[in-house]
């Protein structure tokens, strides 16, 4: 059943941007938190791991619960729940509470993603699911892209205890959600099956396995770019400002790629978009890792790599939701963040390999994931609808 909610995609995309904005405070705040709590590098690593596990790996679990219970009424409160803990971190006095703050933020972020992506699918006009999902993905990418710019500028003028001022936009979006009618849109399957699918059947379905692996391999290359590009440029003799600028170019390319890929998938098949983008991404990715530069050509190649790496994501979410209609929440959680969790394993392998053969060659190895991802996407059964 389709629900007609005015500006639903705009509201959910804005909420996505805000959730990903607040959910990515930790890397920027980490140097300050190390000083405030006397954290070692090991403890910082554990803190980041807690954030990653709660944000990424919990999403399919939360999505599975949402497939059995209607959680739409919680929508207005999830953005404030994701923002408040990190904005109150200046008032935390114990390390254990710091870990709790990070975990609560991660759980709220993990809950927003599958819920809002299901609502995108339920409110999109017929034949516009991929396009609306592309705007949703772009919202999240924009939120992540602006964290360094806004948070660093804020902390240049205000102390850590002033972070609650940044909570004001979350109150506004909560009011908009309450008045939008989205809370009345059920996330439960339209036709409740007499015998619900067993979790094992969902997890080991061919579509689940191959599409998850394909997107996980894509996220390996994407994560390698996002994690090591600044370090690669600095080691190549560039300053940190240039490194930050070119990372932003890569992320903007990804945001545009998600928009274009999602909208094209409404007229072409999701498989064509995903496989085509993955194959087209091989050349710019391999070229940049063998010709590291900050000139115009380097910027154009980086933009193209980011574009092609993110173009498949909206289609993968719609594909998974259509293939698993009784478990749309779980499918959304897998495609949105579990794939990034799988990709992070590849990023860790890239880091370890970089210590042995050098960073640039190790990053070049990560490009090998793209043709494998394309093959897996090609053999994934496409849903009929």
What do these predicted regions represent?
Residues 24, 52-60, 145, 251-255, ...:
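Residue-level signature of mid-helix packing/kink "hotspots" within the transmembrane helices
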Residues 26-27, 207-248, 255:
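Extracytoplasmic gate region of multi-pass secondary transporters
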Residues 57-93:
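Conserved MFS/SLC helix-loop-helix module at the cytosolic interface between two early adjacent transmembrane helices
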Residues 58-70, 258-269, 354-355:
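Helix-to-loop junctions at the C-terminal end of transmembrane segments
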Residues 73-87, 272-287:
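Structural signature of the two symmetry-related core transmembrane helices
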Residues 101-139:
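Cytoplasmic helix-loop-helix junction between adjacent transmembrane helices
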Residues 136-182:
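Helix-loop-helix hairpin linking two adjacent transmembrane segments in secondary transporters
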Residues 326-356:
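A late C-terminal transmembrane helix in Major Facilitator Superfamily
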């Amino acid at each position: 059943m389709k629900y007609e909610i005015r500006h639903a995609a705009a509201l959910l995309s804005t909420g996505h941007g805000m959730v990903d904005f607040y959910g990515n405070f930790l890397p920027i705040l980490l140097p300050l938190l190390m000083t405030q709590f006397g954290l070692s590098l090991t403890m910082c690593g554990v803190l980041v791991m807690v954030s990653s596990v709660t944000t990424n790996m919990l999403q399919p679990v939360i999505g599975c619960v949402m497939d059995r219970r209607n959680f739409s009424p919680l929508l207005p409160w999830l953005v404030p729940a994701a923002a408040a803990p990190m904005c109150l971190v200046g008032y935390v006095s114990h390390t254990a509470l710091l870990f709790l703050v990070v975990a609560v933020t991660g759980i709220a972020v993990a809950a927003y993603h599958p819920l809002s992506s299901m609502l995108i699918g339920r409110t999109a006009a017929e034949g516009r699911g991929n396009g609306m999902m592309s705007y949703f993905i772009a919202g999240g990418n924009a939120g992540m892209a602006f964290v360094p710019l806004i948070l660093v500028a804020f902390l240049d003028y205000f102390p850590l205890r002033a972070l609650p001022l940044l909570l004001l936009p979350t109150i506004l979006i909560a009011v908009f959600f309450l008045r939008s009618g989205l809370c009345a849109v059920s996330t439960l399957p339209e036709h409740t099956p007499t015998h619900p699918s067993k979790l094992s059947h969902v997890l080991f379905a061919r579509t689940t396995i191959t599409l998850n692996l394909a997107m996980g391999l894509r996220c390996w290359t994407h994560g390698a770019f996002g994690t090591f590009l600044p370090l690669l440029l600095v080691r190549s003799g560039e300053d940190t400002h240039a490194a930050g600028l070119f990372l932003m170019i890569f992320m903007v390319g990804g945001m545009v790629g998600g928009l274009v890929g999602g909208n094209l998938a409404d007229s072409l098949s999701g498989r064509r978009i995903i496989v085509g983008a993955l194959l087209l991404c091989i050349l710019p990715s391999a070229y940049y890792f063998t010709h590291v530069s900050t000139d115009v050509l380097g910027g154009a190649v980086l933009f193209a790599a980011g574009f092609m790496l993110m173009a498949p994501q909206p289609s993968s979410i719609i594909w998974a939701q259509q293939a698993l209609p009784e478990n749309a929440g779980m499918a959304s959680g897998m495609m949105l963040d579990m794939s990034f969790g799988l990709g992070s394993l590849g990023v860790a392998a890239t880091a370890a390999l970089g210590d042995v053969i050098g960073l640039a060659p190790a990053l070049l190895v990560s490009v090998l994931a793209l043709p494998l991802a394309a093959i897996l996407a090609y053999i994934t059964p496409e849903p009929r609808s």
